[in-house]
Amino acid sequence: MGDYKSAKEAFVSDNPGASIWSINAVSLVALATYALWIALSPYIRHGLLNNYLICVLPLLFGVTIFSTSPLVFTSFLSIISLAFITKSQKCFKSVSSPEKPKGQWLDESDSDEEPAEPASAAGSAAVSPVKLLPSQVAFASGSLLSPDPTTSPMSPSSSSASGHEDPLGIMGVNRRRSLLEGVSLDVPSHIDSKVRISPVPYLRLKKSRATKAQWVKEKGRLPFLTVYRAHMMLMTVICILAVDFEVFPRWQGKCEDFGTSLMDVGVGSFVFSLGLVSTKSLSPPPPTPTPSSPALNSHIIPLTPSPFTSILISLRKSIPILVLGFIRLIMVKGSDYPEHVTEYGVHWNFFFTLALVPVLAVGIRPLTQWLRWSVLGVIISLLHQLWLTYYLQSIVFSFGRSGIFLANKEGFSSLPGYLSIFLIGLSIGDHVLRLSLPPRRERVVSETNEEHEQSHFERKKLDLIMELIGYSLGWWALLGGWIWAGGEVSRRLANAPYVFWVAAYNTTFLLGYLLLTHIIPSPTSSQTSPSILVPPLLDAMNKNGLAIFLAANLLTGLVNVSMKTMYAPAWLSMGVLMLYTLTISCVGWILKGRRIKI
C-alpha cells in the first residue's frame, strides 16, 4: 500500500497544465449540453434517466475521452440542438398562426376606411380592438341602455327616488352588479387577454388565478444562474474522481506551482459561485421588497448588529462546513489515503477555505460604504500580490513545514486570494440580483401587471448582458496585461493573475448561460419558462450543492480505497465514472424539491 500511495502522489504531481484557451474550449461542452437540453426538453419526459443522459453524460465524456478534441464534440452537440430547435419552431409556428375569419376581426391597419393610428410608447400597436355587443358596451361604460326611460337605473326619476334612501349610491352599484350576471363577454379564445375595447377606452379582462399565481411563483427564478452553478458543481464532482484515472488527461489536473488547468479554475469557480449567491446576505437590502428566488437564496445575516456580532453570526453559520473539514481530515489521516500535500498543506483542506472566506467578507463589509465589492477585491488581491512577491512566495515554495503555519502554508497564504475571488463574485451578484427587483414605475394602461413586470425583466436582462460583456472584457484585459508583463498564474498561491483569471472565466461563462436563455427561443409560448430552461436534476444540485459535494467526496474516497484507479484501463475507468456520476445524480434526484442546508 505504501508503494502505491507514493506512486499515486507522484501520478498527480508536477502537472504542467494547459493553455487558457484549451481550458475554455473544454468548458464549452457545458454550454452545449445546456443548449441540447433546451432543444430536446419538449420531446422527452423530464425523468432521472433523461436528465442524466442529456445533462451529465455528455459533460463526463467532454472532460475525459473527448477533451483532446473539445470543439469537435461541442460542434456535434450544437448541430443536434440546432436541428431540434429549428424543427420545434416550425411546428410551433404552424399551430400558433390561426387564419383570421374574414369580415369579423380587423386590425385598424387592415381597414381601408381610416389610416392606422400610430403606435403608442407603451407598445399598444400590438393590441387589437374587439367588437362588443351594445349591452356589453353599455355595461363597460357604467350604464345599461333600456328601452323604457322610466325604468332605467340612470333616469332622473330613479335617481331622485333613491336619493334619500341610498345617499352613497350603494344600491345603484349593487343593481349594476346584479345586471352583470346576465351579461357575457363573448371574446374569441384565440384573442389575447390584453385588448383595447372600442369605443370604451380600456377594459381589463382578468386572467385566471391559476395562471397568474404560477407566473408570480416562477418569475423570481433565474434559470441561467441555476444552471451555471449546477454545471460548476457537476464539473467539480466529475473531476475530483476522474483525476485519479488515466483516462483523465494529466494536463487537466491541478498544477504544482504555476500554470493553468481545468481543475485549477474549478477550485476558484467554487468560491466565485459562493460569493455570487451570498449577495443577499452580505449586501445592503434593496429599497423595495424582492421576490424570493431559489437561485439567489442564501442564509441572511442581519445588518443591524455590530461588526463583531455579525462576524460571530457568520462564524456560527460556518460551523457545519468546518465540521466537514475536520471529518475529512480525520478520514484522510486515519486511512493512509493518498494526498497531495502541496495543494493546501498537511492539515488544511478546501472545506476550511469555504468556511472562513464568508467570515472574512463580513469583517470587511463596513468598507462597502465607500468602496464596491469588486474594488475591494482588486485592492486585496494587489496587496496580497505585493506580499507574495517580496516575502511570502519564497516561504510557500520552501520545503520547511515545522509548526502549524508552515505545515499549512498553502492554505493560510491563499486565503487573501480566495477572499478577493469571493468579493468579486459578490459584485457580480449585485448586478444579477437586479433581475429579481420589481419595477418601480407605473405601468401603462394597455399592460397588465404581469406583462409590465415581464417587460421590465426583459429590459433588465439586456442591461445585465451588456454589463457582463463589459466586465468580461475588463477581466480578460487585466489578465492578458499581467501575463504580457511576465506574470504567471498560480492556484497554489491564489495570486493576482489567478484571481483575474477566475473572475474572467466565470463572468464569461455566466454571460454564456444568460445568452442561451435569451437567444434560443423556447418551443413553448413562454420563452423564459423555468420548467423548460432548468433541468430538474440541475435544479436539485443547485439547491443542495454542499450535500452533493459531500456525497461526491465520500464516494471518491470509497472508490480510491477499493481499487487502484491509476492502473485501470479506459473501459473500466469510464464504467466506474458513469456509475459514480449516476449515483450522484440519484442522490440529487432524491433531494429534488428539498433544500439541505449544511
From Swiss-Prot:
EC top class, as a word: transferase
Q: In which pathway does it act?
A: Glycolipid biosynthesis; glycosylphosphatidylinositol-anchor biosynthesis
Spell out where the chain crosses the membrane. 20-40, 53-73, 223-243, 258-278, 307-327, 344-364, 377-397, 412-432, 464-484, 500-520, 571-591
Topology relative to the lipid bilayer, per the entry, is: Multi-pass membrane protein
User: Where is there biased composition of kind Low complexity?
Assistant: 117-127, 144-162
Q: Which domain of life is it from?
A: Eukaryota
GO molecular-function terms, A-Z: glucosaminyl-phosphatidylinositol O-acyltransferase activity
Where is composition skewed (Acidic residues) in this entry?
107-116
InterPro entries registered for this protein in UniProt: PIGW/GWT1
Similarity comment: family membership: Belongs to the PIGW family.
Function in brief: Probable acetyltransferase, which acetylates the inositol ring of phosphatidylinositol during biosynthesis of GPI-anchor.
Q: Which named protein is this?
A: GPI-anchored wall transfer protein 1
- Organism the protein comes from: Cryptococcus neoformans var. grubii serotype A (strain H99 / ATCC 208821 / CBS 10515 / FGSC 9487)
UniProt gene name: GWT1
